Amino acid sequence: MGRTLAEKVWDAHVVRRADGEPDLLYIDLHLVHEVTSPQAFEALRLAGRPVRRPDLTLATEDHNVPTTDTLLPIADPVSRAQVEALRKNCADFGVRLFPMNDPDQGIVHVVGPQLGLSEPGMTIVCGDSHTSTHGAFGALAFGIGTSQVEHVLATQTLPQRRPKTMAVTVQGELPAGVTAKDLILAVIARIGTGGGAGYVIEYRGEAVRGLSMEGRMTVCNMSIEAGARAGMIAPDETTFEYLRGRPNAPTGADWDAAVEYWRTLATDPDATFDHEVVIDGPSLSPYVTWGTNPGQAAPLSSPVPDPAAYADPAARGSVERALAYMDLVPGTPLSDVAVDTVFIGSCTNGRISDLRDAADVLRGRQVADGLRVLVVPGSMAVKAEAEAEGLDEVFRAAGADWRSAGCSMCLGMNPDTLRPGERSASTSNRNFEGRQGPGGRTHLVSPAVAAATAVTGRLTAPADL
């Protein structure tokens, strides 16, 4: 019987299997940052254990780092302590670290791919929900907790129960102006924030194949927002061309052998998925979230939903609570909703193509009066590339604030936050209550919509400028 992509990668990494027990998986790449690793390293230290494979472990500072004044000490004592702990732990255990201001520093899920560390057929873990980003390469990548971080550091293995498989097929081509971010928001709105629970989602279809690698990373990044364990896309020529020549990618005969193997990482024609979802690509349009979870999303051209339209009492109550927090009135056109802040960045949309999309919209235009716009590259390498292309000048000329690399306003763990009652259009991945700061209200959008919103001061599709 045929196997899915996820099943092939899983089976290739099982080092121990026993009835009634989780499979023991070998881990090819372990990514580490300052927030979920201190307790794990300390547990190793207390037990007198080394890191099993420091050569397969990479750390970077991203969550807590400021994106301005990066040459000064970190002001917040908790953030400073976590960053200092990571530096000491990496030095003590021989783990490679990209600290603030290092040319390779950045958000962990941006750094791995740009260095060619994320490759098809790998197992990749990190103490971070959005590790599924790396599934865009045909890797099985998922987030883990701090105790699991310790287990991987100590053994390079992880006990896991085999997940179910789901296919999300996006048929046809995406219309002009519709991006990977719109696609994944539409998927989550369709299946819900729990629709992927217990599954590894494989994204398929013409629309998915038409995405760039960076677009594919955006899609896989938000798989966790549908409740999925991971998201994957089978590798193809787009994947190979992205990886070719990157610092840690194979070369010469090793490259040829790798590509030959990578070509086998496709779901077999006779394989079956546990669940399948089909979405019509040509019918999609720019999406925006209106509520307090990523599944509460709709086309930007639609109105704020009416709770009365929901027959299920639980769903109706959820919508009522979300609208109360977001301070939105049912029936209001989403395109009339004004914002105070625009954030362009994060591991979802902080790559060079995202910045190019935003710059294309802002070029020759001005940010609306009184609006705060933060543009934060996902890594120092992305920052350097954007500056070499003059994108920073486009953003500054428009009135946006060009920052250094980091997670920034994606989450309220660093100086870049919303004030209570402020509303943002954000290219990040979560719009939970208080996610960007206590009392902050978040609308998730694509970089292009974020840039158009920056011009008008209200949620706007670029086509409407």
Curated annotation (Swiss-Prot):
Locate the residues binding [4Fe-4S] cluster: C347, C407, C410
Q: What is its EC number?
A: 4.2.1.33
- Kindly state which keywords UniProt assigns to this record, in alphabetical order: 4Fe-4S, Amino-acid biosynthesis, Branched-chain amino acid biosynthesis, Iron, Iron-sulfur, Leucine biosynthesis, Lyase, Metal-binding
Query: What cofactor does this protein call for?
Result: [4Fe-4S] cluster
Q: Quote the cofactor binding remark.
A: Binds 1 [4Fe-4S] cluster per subunit.
Known pathway: Amino-acid biosynthesis; L-leucine biosynthesis; L-leucine from 3-methyl-2-oxobutanoate: step 2/4
- One record GO biological process: L-leucine biosynthetic process
The reactions it catalyses are: (2R,3S)-3-isopropylmalate = (2S)-2-isopropylmalate
Q: Which GO terms describe its molecular function?
A: 3-isopropylmalate dehydratase activity; 4 iron, 4 sulfur cluster binding; metal ion binding
To which protein family does this belong?
Belongs to the aconitase/IPM isomerase family. LeuC type 1 subfamily.
* Subunit structure comment from the entry: Heterodimer of LeuC and LeuD.
What's the stated role of this polypeptide? Catalyzes the isomerization between 2-isopropylmalate and 3-isopropylmalate, via the formation of 2-isopropylmaleate.
Would you tell me the protein name for this molecule?
3-isopropylmalate dehydratase large subunit
Q: Please report the organism this UniProt entry assigns to the protein.
A: Parafrankia sp. (strain EAN1pec)
User: Which lineage ranks, top first, belong to the organism behind this chain?
Assistant: Bacteria, Bacillati, Actinomycetota, Actinomycetes, Frankiales
